[in-house]
Amino acid sequence: MMKPLRQQNRQIISYIPRVEPAPPEHAIKMDAFRDVWILRGKYVAFVLMGESFQRSPAFSVPESAQRWANQVRQENEIAD
C-alpha cells in the first residue's frame, strides 16, 4: 500500500512581491540608475508603489534590476 501524500489540501501560494518599507540602511544607491541599490553584492531595485516599496529579486547586473523596476512601474500605471 502506498503512503498517501502529506498535506494534500494545502493551498498553492502564488508569488506576491514582498512589500518593503524602504531600502535598508546598508543598501548602496547607484547613481547611474533610477531604482537600483547594491545589497550584499547583488543589484536590487526598489520601486515606490503608493505608500510602500516593492523590492525586486536580486540580480547580478544592474541593468536587469532597472529593467525589472521599469516593468513594475509600467504594469502599475496600466493597473491604475
Curated annotation (Swiss-Prot):
Keywords from the named record: Cell cycle, Cell division, DNA-binding
The protein's name in its UniProt record: Cell division activator CedA
Protein source organism: Salmonella arizonae (strain ATCC BAA-731 / CDC346-86 / RSK2980)
HAMAP family: CedA (MF_01580)
Lineage: Bacteria, Pseudomonadati, Pseudomonadota, Gammaproteobacteria, Enterobacterales
Keyword set includes Cell division: yes
Top-level taxon of origin: Bacteria
The keyword ATP-binding belongs to this UniProt entry's keyword annotation: no
Protein purpose: Activates the cell division inhibited by chromosomal DNA over-replication.
